[in-house]
Each structure stands twice: as C-alpha cells, then as structure tokens.
C-alpha cells in the first residue's frame, strides 16, 4: 500500500503519520545523555567515586550502569543487602545529582529452591523446556539457570511484572543483557539436535525473539509507572 499524506506543515504531516502507525514510545530525556558502564562497581562508594570524578572533571554524566555485582548472588530482581542496605535512598541520592542508575537484568533465573522467582517459574511452567518436557538448565553467572520462555505470553507478563521491584525503588531504566540467550555451558551444548517436532523451536532459530520480548516487558513496566 502507498499512503500520501498532505498537511499544512511538517508538524501536521508527522501528526497524521503517527495517527496511521500508532504512537511511539518517547524515551526519557536522560536516555539521550552520557552513560558510564564498567564491570566491578560493587558498593555505593564505588558509584559515588565515579560520579564525583565525572563532576570534578566537568565531564557530562547522566547514567551509571550497574553490573551484576549489585545483585544478591547474581539473582535477577534482587539487591545485595550488604552493599546496598538502603537501595531506594541511594537511587534518590544519585537522582539528586541528575544521575540515573541503570541496573542490569540477565536472561536467566538462578536454580535455587526458596528463591521466589525460581519457585514461581517452575510451578507455572514459565521456563524453556527440553524435548522431554523438563526445564532446560544451563550455566550462567549465578550457576545453574533456567530461562523464561518469552514465546509464552503468560511467562512474558510474569517476568515483566518482576521489574516493578526495582521501579518502585526509583529505577527508571534497565540494561537487559545476555538476550541471545547467552550460556556458558549445558549438557546439550555439544550435541546435535535433529528431528525435533515442529512445535519445538531450537534456540538458534528463536534468538532474535527473547531480546525483543524482554525489552517489551521492561518498557511496558516503565510506561505503567
């Protein structure tokens, strides 16, 4: 189809165009700014030192990314109580300096009995499966890990809702990482997978999907804010 749009000016044409395709999400202003990302920042003092260095040297800084060390044992949607005992207050402290903290969220959920997200995922069959129907296990940063099935709408909503934990503490953006999904090793890593039923999707064939779905999960939660 070809659309011809007439308008009084460029603004009017853009307005009509957006009416055709739907309104797009407008990122927050800070997202267009400068960010600092480095593995190894573990405590509040690490982040304070980075922020101070930028300010004292008159270098723009709008975001500091938080790698996996802010978590409790590298578990998604957790914060180390030892290193960040008052996390929401620290987030506000950085916000007062016009610096947003952007925490990483990895694609895998640690296999750990008693870990709420793991227990919920197993109970509701939200994780990717092997051909025999058992939950797929691979090793990533936290050790043995399950991966939320982003082709399952219920699993997507469930995983997306977990972002609220951080949003409610003042977080306004996320670093969704390891969306390939990345794995270090698994029992199937060196085995050929052939003759799977059509209803089963090999990971290489589905690789573009998890990242897209996880981005959608997090953005929808931020918009809800």
Enumerate the language-model features and the residues they cover.
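Catalytic-domain carbohydrate-binding cleft regions of carbohydrate-active enzymes
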Residues: 1-225
